[in-house]
Swiss-Prot record:
The lineage of its organism: Bacteria, Bacillati, Actinomycetota, Actinomycetes, Mycobacteriales. This is 1D-myo-inositol 2-acetamido-2-deoxy-alpha-D-glucopyranoside deacetylase. Its EC number is 3.5.1.103. Signal peptide: none annotated. It catalyses: 1D-myo-inositol 2-acetamido-2-deoxy-alpha-D-glucopyranoside + H2O = 1D-myo-inositol 2-amino-2-deoxy-alpha-D-glucopyranoside + acetate. The gene is mshB.
Amino acid sequence: MLKNDLSGARVVAVHAHPDDEAITTGGVLADLAARGADVTVITCTLGEQGEVIGETFAQLVNGDADQLGGFRIHELYASLEILGVRGIHLGGAGCWRDSGMVGDPANEHPRAFIHSGDRAVEQLKELLAELKPHLLITYGPDGGYGHPDHIRAHEITHAAAGEQRILWAVSDREELEDGLKAITGLPEGWGRGELSAVDSVDLSVELNDEVYATKVESMRAHATQLWIADGSVSRTNPVAAHAVTQQDNVKVWALSNLIAQPIMRHEHYQLGAGTPLPEGATGVLDGLEF
């Protein structure tokens, strides 16, 4: 793989909250940037409704100090720096608020992203007119796991896009289940649960060791939200977690719900719109001219 072989390519990923860029697309974004592509992550909210892992900053949550969104800006930009990509907040930081899950009282907040309407579409159109991406990455119609903000990110991306290829970040069920079966020991308090995945994908992008390590570090930057069970600790979460997996080159992680899952060695995509992927494609830009 040659450095700068993607020079001239422009890619925009539209994500709902800080940490989504790392979890769902961190490997691909890091690889694109390392190979010379111009990569921008547009984040639509500050993730104010998130829970917090660890006691250090637990009182930042919405029900207490309601300062989590501001804190997560710093986590986001640490992650983006690790990935080597640019970051933009849709409408400016704080324009749109995390809507929470369906039924959350946060759904009724006047700045909740689910109420963003045509204004958010126009904001994204203006950014895309400036950035001129060859490729857009976001989620599928269900947002990946049903979060209203993820669904809204999908909606505004398709509404604002021109004729660019749009890829939806998904999880391949077979690889996910193989990774889950390989986990033979869980940290104390962690468990197993249902995880969202799809039965078929249009593209699987393999993450080499360097890219995989970069993705893991970008995820680690979101320490209030993600816990990686490799014995590491941080100021945010000084408690180490250890998982046992039969896949030596795969790490195990969890959100605040402590449902264990593998950080898979591939990132998976479905074609949402635009130029089809050529047969045998191995990269998100395959078949595009730039």
